Amino acid sequence: MGRSFEVRKASMAKTAGAKIKVYSKYGKEIYMCAKNGGGDPDMNLSLKHLIAKAKKDQVPAHVIDKAIDKANGGGGEDYTPARYEGFGPGGTSVIVDCLTDNGNRTFQDVRQCFVKVGAKIGVEGSVSHMFDHQAVFQFKGEDDEIILETLMMEDVDVTDVELEDGVITVFAPHTEFFKTKTALNGAFPDLTIDVEEITFVPQTHTPVAGEDAEKFQKFLDLLDDCDDVQQVYHNGEL
């Protein structure tokens, strides 16, 4: 019983720690979004989307409300976005997005994640040209043609529509996010969108195996442990 309890306790602590990190990241992002664009979701579409995304990831309402109240109060920290690019284990390409109140600290923290696995942080533009900045929507369906026709009729600049195993994925330029979402919701009011995000989609994937795969997973875990890291994009295929 003693050993199993210790293992269970460690697992619970890890789960709790992961939840706290998710809450913290969303809290910071919601705070900055509300501070820059206003705390009313009906007037700030970016905030409205972010709140919906947070709820989907089971972020408690009190975390969301606290971040918005903090922004409305006019006080608090002033975070700025920071993006780092580099080459991860196995020749992978990596983009790391952060929100920081101390750029020097954040750069050193992210750089150490690269260094610890023998990877190399690069300069701005070193790998971002290998990704497409896209709005991505994913939902269950079988008729990708009707989705494409509908979006084109609504004058949405669609990049691609894919159908695989009963799941439709819509790609559009990141600037077309809200236009695409509005068109889908308007044409298909009963549609449940499982994924709706702005992301960096790799143009090609790099297979990672063996020792490189272990290093790559460690690398992702190290970045996940950085308080200022909000999102990591990569082309690694484990």
Swiss-Prot record:
GO cellular component: cytosol
One MF annotation (Gene Ontology) recorded for this entry: DNA binding
Presence of the UniProt keyword Ubl conjugation in the record: no
UniProt subcellular location: Cytoplasm
KW DNA-binding (keyword) present: yes
Keywords noted in UniProt: Cytoplasm, DNA-binding, Transcription, Transcription regulation
SUPFAM superfamilies associated with the record: YebC-like
Family: Belongs to the TACO1 family.
NCBIfam families with a match to the protein in the record: PRK12378.1
HAMAP family with a match to the protein in the record: Transcrip_reg_TACO1
Protein name stated in the entry: Probable transcriptional regulatory protein VIBHAR_07036
Record organism: Vibrio campbellii (strain ATCC BAA-1116)
